[in-house]
């Protein structure tokens, strides 16, 4: 999972966020932002992320509120013999008004509507999934729900809790970076003073 925040890119490929500075980002700014994000939990409220992570982890087809979805059946195309022309086996699953679906945690809704969720239709604020893989309408319906659960799990990933050891590590990095910054300022200041002392006799 990768999230852009200001001048920083957050990459969630490990249990902890790995912060990578953009090319135009200065080292001092990068360190200060890293410490701020980890120490102050500015990425989001801890409880919200825990709730969202637990919700995604427990998500399954049988636990979905079926009355929140609209199901439509149409005639399928492709191979299938006479059954294709006679039976409306193609299933289209729609979840309207995603932003107002209170049964989905807010943090999950934010991710689903961010453009990373392949089944999200921004214009109608809806999730639309289709399946005509089989000749059975019930099987196609089940496949729509399975696609929904699978895609949510793949798209919505949340970081684990930041340990005290990690926070301490980044505080040390910040302290070291501050010392280097002050030293650089002193060296620069001394250079300016030395240049001002040079006098030329003509």
Swiss-Prot record:
What Gene Ontology cellular component terms go with this record? mitochondrial large ribosomal subunit
Q: What InterPro entries does UniProt report for this protein, alphabetically?
A: Mito_Release_Factor_mL62 (IPR052104), Pep_chain_release_fac_I (IPR000352)
One GO BP on record is: mitochondrial translational termination
Record GO terms (molecular function): peptidyl-tRNA hydrolase activity; translation release factor activity, codon nonspecific
Which PANTHER family has this protein been placed in?
LARGE RIBOSOMAL SUBUNIT PROTEIN ML62 (PTHR11075:SF54), PEPTIDE CHAIN RELEASE FACTOR (PTHR11075)
Its name, as the record gives it, is Putative uncharacterized protein YOL114C
Name its species.
Answer: Saccharomyces cerevisiae (strain ATCC 204508 / S288c) (Baker's yeast)
């Amino acid at each position: 999972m990768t999230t852009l925040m200001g001048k920083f890119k957050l990459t969630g490929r490990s249990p902890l966020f790995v912060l990578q500075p953009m090319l135009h980002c200065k080292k001092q700014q990068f360190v200060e932002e890293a410490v701020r994000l980890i120490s102050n939990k500015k990425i989001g409220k801890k409880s919200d992320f825990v709730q969202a992570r637990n919700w995604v982890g427990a998500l399954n087809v049988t636990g979905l509120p079926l009355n929140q979805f609209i199901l439509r059946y149409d005639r399928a195309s492709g191979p299938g013999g006479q059954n294709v022309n006679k039976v409306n086996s193609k299933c289209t699953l729609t979840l309207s008004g995603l932003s107002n679906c209170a049964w989905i945690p807010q943090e999950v809704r934010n991710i689903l509507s961010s453009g990373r969720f392949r089944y999200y239709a921004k214009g109608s604020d809806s999730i639309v999934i289709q399946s005509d893989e089989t000749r059975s309408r019930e099987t196609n319906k089940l496949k729509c729900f399975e696609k929904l659960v699978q895609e949510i799990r793949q798209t919505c990933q949340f970081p684990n809790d930041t340990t005290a050891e990690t926070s301490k590590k980044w505080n040390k990095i910040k302290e070291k970076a501050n010392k280097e910054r002050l030293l650089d300022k002193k060296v620069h200041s001394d250079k300016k003073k030395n240049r001002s002392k040079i006098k030329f006799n003509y």
